Curated annotation (Swiss-Prot):
Disulfide bridges in this chain: none
GO biological process terms on file: DNA recombination; transposition
UniProt name for this protein: Transposase C from transposon PsiTn554
Any Pfam family hit: DUF6262
Encoding gene, per UniProt annotation: tnpC
One MF annotation (Gene Ontology) recorded for this entry: DNA binding
Signal peptide feature range: none
InterPro entries in UniProt: TnpC-like
Organism: Staphylococcus aureus
């Protein structure tokens, strides 16, 4: 006597359609961020396309894509120091040698002052 027939196929179809549209929005956002050089992370993608971060984390393929792009950006942002030329190394060595000599002279001067003060103190007693 139950005349209600549940038709869930349409609900399932609409849910899949919504999910597909969301995927397309996220893919467009990721592509846009790659082209324009923006930081790619879950927060920025979620804000750009108005999707929840939990949905991004739940979808494994999208999650892996964002994580790999984020890692690639981090490694590309690490800037290696330019190698010093032999000329700049020579200048640095000369500067450091000069500084060492100045410090040695100052040290010698201070040691002489200490010896003099010890002598004065000893003669006082």
């Amino acid at each position: 006597m139950n005349k209600q027939v549940r038709n869930t196929t349409e609900i399932v179809r609409l849910a899949k359609l919504k999910s597909q549209k969301t995927r397309e929005k996220v893919d467009k956002a990721i592509s846009k961020f790659c082209i324009e050089g923006f930081a790619i992370n879950f927060n920025s993608i979620a804000k750009e396309r108005n999707v929840s971060k939990s949905w991004l984390y739940k979808e494994h393929d999208i999650r892996q894509r964002i994580e790999s792009l984020r890692e690639r950006q981090i490694t590309s942002n690490v800037v290696s120091k330019p190698k010093k030329s032999s000329r700049s190394e020579e200048i640095l060595i000369k500067t450091l040698k000069r500084r060492v000599m100045e410090l040695e002279k100052e040290n010698k001067k201070l040691q002489n002052q200490i010896q003099k003060l010890y002598g004065d103190l000893y003669n006082k007693e």
